[in-house]
């Protein structure tokens, strides 16, 4: 059922070391404020912190009470306050207001600010402007890599996507470079590096500088990971905009997986309580169904339930000695498996109910038509009806973006019509969202004679490579065209199927979208790894209108074992989806690779749209 790893599959590195490092550094920072202290934690950091150091660990290091950072006066009576926050201006203003309030009240306390994952000069400037710089000590907790699973690392920076791809803010590039530097320090150098996208190139260049400055740290080390591939999210928006149909992706779309765990409500747990469940390889039931197409999952869970019942029924014919062994060795494991099985069956039933209500089949049919370029008028009518029925503003926006990207922009008549209908249906406050989507290249209007010539492509790429900021704005309209149809043809993203696609025995990565579409990002990775370079992909790179790079260090490659050369680290800048992860796991099984994923955050179509929206729900 699940994709069993090939017997010759390489072993994954042990990433638990990253957790220990992060925990030790945090404890060191907390101990710099000796004695009892209250800890104020920003909401964004609560889940990642829980995976690194739980409440009991914090208590051991004299953290008395925990508070959530909220825009209201602090109720703490402690003489020492510690703040664990993201490096944001609003957080610094909030901390400064608390310090100034204490000053006015004549109260003397000690204050420590721990900024994660990085300390920015602008943050200290705010403290200076507010007149509290001398009262507060500022430190950095360089916690930028959280292992969510054996093969998945997350930087837990969902804001990266909007900051970079909409605002052009490059501050997180240093964080990415530092994270890659940490990985190469711990797990040896990467002999082969590939990448595509402007952000990927900048991250790579900065990382190489860090490597050169501290070359002695990795000198002589045997590489544990043979290849690294950096990829910008805007190289492939289409995959991220599609509805997910693998089990883990559907759970994320339906319940929102946050920091590797999910809150299952009463409709799943069949009780009056919600339950927080960690979803990773340790959950034996989940690990067998996570990468499966949803249509296969119910059958598997039913069979699993029957097998479990048969194991319970074995008790009936046992004598006392056998019963004793059964209770001490097997019963606990069976009960745990039974609990997990009940949860996943409940989750499947809940997903089925929601999807039936939404007419999921019709939605998928429309998406497939958009991907294939068929019945565009019919698909446009479906989107109009979606807007008219006021289904979900996010869902309607997603479909409009998918139509725009697959069609290389909307014809002016359709763009104006859909935009007007949307604003009338959901409210004029969404107007700024349309501006954001246009700037990011997600929802654009075709101009007369709108085609991208080879010359324009080269000029745009040259500017993108050589300069940042304002110069690229002049070329943004060139750089944002998708050319999806041409790329799709070149890379055979829409498989030709003779007869019905067998989702039980998938033949290629397209199974993650019911056999209709191979994720563009995954196909690019596959093609480059097959060639060990970008050779022969010049036309694809031109159509993508991105800068690509490849670098091989033969001296390091010679030191690498054949096993490590089959380990590939894929870095998604701007987020990756569970569908892409499942597709690459499948590719790994087929080709004898093991993929490791590093992402700025796990994303899906709803998160992508919410990041662009100016209307916060």
Swiss-Prot record:
Q: Where in the cell is it found?
A: Late endosome membrane; Lysosome membrane; Early endosome; Cytoplasmic vesicle, Clathrin-coated vesicle
- Work out whether the entry's keyword set contains Acetylation: yes
- In the record, N-acetylalanine modifications are located at 2
Instruction: Offer one example of a GO biological process linked to this entry.
Output: melanosome localization
The disulfide bridges present are none
Q: How is it modified after translation?
A: Phosphorylated on tyrosine residues.
Q: Single GO cellular component annotation? A: late endosome membrane
Q: Disruption effect?
A: Increased platelet account and deficiency in platelet alpha-granules associated with bleeding diathesis and decreases aggregate formation; reduction of mature ype-II multivesicular bodies (MVB II) in megakaryocytes.
Family annotation (Gene3D superfamilies): 1.25.40.850, 3.40.50.1910, 3.40.50.2060, Syntaxin Binding Protein 1, Chain A, domain 2 (3.90.830.10)
Keyword field: Acetylation, Cytoplasmic vesicle, Endosome, Lysosome, Membrane, Phosphoprotein, Protein transport, Transport
Instruction: Extract the InterPro entries matched here.
Output: Sec-1-like_dom1 (IPR043154), Sec-1-like_dom3a (IPR043127), Sec1-like (IPR001619), Sec1-like_dom2 (IPR027482), Sec1-like_sf (IPR036045), VPS33_dom3b (IPR043155)
Please indicate if the UniProt record lists Ribosomal protein as a keyword: no
UniProt GO MF annotations = protein-containing complex binding
> What domain of life?
Eukaryota
User: Pfam families recorded for this chain?
Assistant: Sec1
Q: How does it sit in the membrane?
A: Peripheral membrane protein
Family, according to the entry, reads as follows:
Belongs to the STXBP/unc-18/SEC1 family.
Task: Give the misc comment.
Answer: Vps33b-deficient inner medullary collecting duct cells display abnormal expression of membrane proteins such as Ceacam5, structural and functional tight junction defects and reduced E-cadherin expression.
What functional role does this protein have?
May play a role in vesicle-mediated protein trafficking to lysosomal compartments and in membrane docking/fusion reactions of late endosomes/lysosomes. Required for proper trafficking and targeting of the collagen-modifying enzyme lysyl hydroxylase 3 (LH3) to intracellular collagen. Mediates phagolysosomal fusion in macrophages. Proposed to be involved in endosomal maturation implicating in part VIPAS39. In epithelial cells, the VPS33B:VIPAS39 complex may play a role in the apical RAB11A-dependentrecycling pathway and in the maintenance of the apical-basolateral polarity.
Q: How does it assemble?
A: Interacts with RAB11A and VIPAS39. Associates with adapter protein complex 3 (AP-3), clathrin:AP-3 and clathrin:HGS complexes.
Official protein name in the record: Vacuolar protein sorting-associated protein 33B
Q: Which organism is it from?
A: Mus musculus (Mouse)
């Amino acid at each position: 059922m699940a994709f069993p790893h090939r017997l010759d599959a390489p072993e994954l590195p042990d990433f638990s070391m990253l957790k220990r490092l992060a925990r030790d550094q945090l404890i060191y920072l907390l101990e710099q404020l000796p004695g009892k202290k209250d800890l104020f934690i920003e909401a964004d950091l609560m889940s990642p912190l829980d995976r690194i150091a739980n409440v009991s660990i914090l208590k051991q290091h004299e953290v008395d009470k925990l508070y959530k950072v909220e825009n209201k006066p602090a109720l703490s009576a402690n003489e020492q306050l510690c703040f664990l926050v993201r490096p944001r201006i609003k957080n610094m203003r909030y901390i400064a207001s608390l310090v100034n309030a204490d000053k006015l009240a004549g109260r003397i306390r000690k204050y420590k600010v721990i900024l994660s994952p990085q300390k920015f000069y602008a943050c200290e400037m705010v403290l200076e402007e507010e007149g509290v710089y001398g009262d507060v000590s500022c430190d950095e907790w360089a916690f930028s890599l959280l292992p969510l699973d054996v093969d998945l690392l997350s930087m837990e920076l969902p804001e990266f996507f909007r900051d970079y791809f909409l605002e052009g803010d490059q501050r997180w590039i240093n964080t990415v470079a530092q994270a890659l530097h940490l990985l190469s320090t711990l797990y040896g150098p990467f002999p082969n590096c590939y990448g595509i996208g402007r952000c990927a190139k900048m991250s790579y260049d900065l990382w190489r500088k860090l490597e050169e400055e501290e070359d002695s740290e990795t000198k002589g080390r045997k590489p544990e990971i043979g290849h690294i591939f950096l990829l910008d999210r805007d190289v492939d928006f289409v995959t991220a905009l599609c509805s997910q149909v693998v089990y883990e992706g559907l759970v994320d779309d339906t319940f929102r997986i946050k920091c590797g765990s999910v809150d299952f409500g009463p409709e799943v747990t069949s009780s009056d309580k919600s339950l927080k469940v960690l979803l990773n390889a340790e959950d034996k039931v989940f690990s067998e169904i996570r990468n499966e197409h949803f249509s296969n999952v119910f059958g598997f869970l039913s069979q699993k339930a029957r097998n479990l019942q048969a194991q319970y029924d074995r008790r009936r014919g046992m004598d006392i000695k056998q019963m004793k062994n059964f209770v001490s060795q097997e019963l606990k494991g069976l009960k745990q498996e039974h609990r997990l099985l009940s949860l996943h069956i409940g989750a499947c039933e809940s997903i089925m109910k929601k999807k039936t209500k939404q007419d999921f089949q019709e939605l998928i049919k429309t998406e497939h038509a958009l991907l294939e370029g068929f019945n565009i008028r019919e698909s446009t009518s479906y989107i109009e009806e979606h807007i008219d029925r006021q289904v979900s503003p996010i869902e309607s926006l997603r479909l409009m973006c998918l139509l725009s990207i697959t069609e290389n922009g909307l014809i002016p008549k359709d763009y104006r019509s859909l935009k007007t209908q949307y604003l009338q249906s959901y409210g004029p406050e969404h107007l700024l969202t349309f501006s954001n989507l246009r700037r990011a290249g997600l929802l654009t209007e075709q101009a007369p004679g709108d085609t991208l010539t080879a010359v324009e492509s080269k000029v745009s790429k040259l500017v993108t490579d050589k300069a940042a900021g304002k110069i690229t704005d002049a070329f943004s309209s060139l750089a944002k065209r998708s050319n999806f149809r041409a790329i799709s043809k070149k890379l055979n993203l829409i498989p030709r199927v003779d007869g019905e696609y067998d989702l039980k025995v998938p033949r290629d990565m397209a199974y993650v979208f019911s056999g209709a579409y191979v994720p563009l990002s995954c196909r690019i990775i596959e093609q480059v790894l097959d060639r060990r370079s970008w050779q022969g992909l010049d036309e694809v790179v031109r159509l993508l209108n991105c800068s690509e790079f490849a670098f091989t260090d033969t001296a390091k490659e010679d030191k690498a074992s054949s096993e490590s050369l089959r380990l590939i680290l894929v870095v998604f800048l701007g987020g990756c989806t569970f569908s892409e992860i499942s597709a690459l796991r499948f590719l790994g099984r087929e080709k004898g690779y093991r993929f490791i994923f590093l992402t700025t955050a796990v994303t899906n179509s709803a998160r992508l749209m919410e990041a662009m929206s100016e209307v916060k729900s």
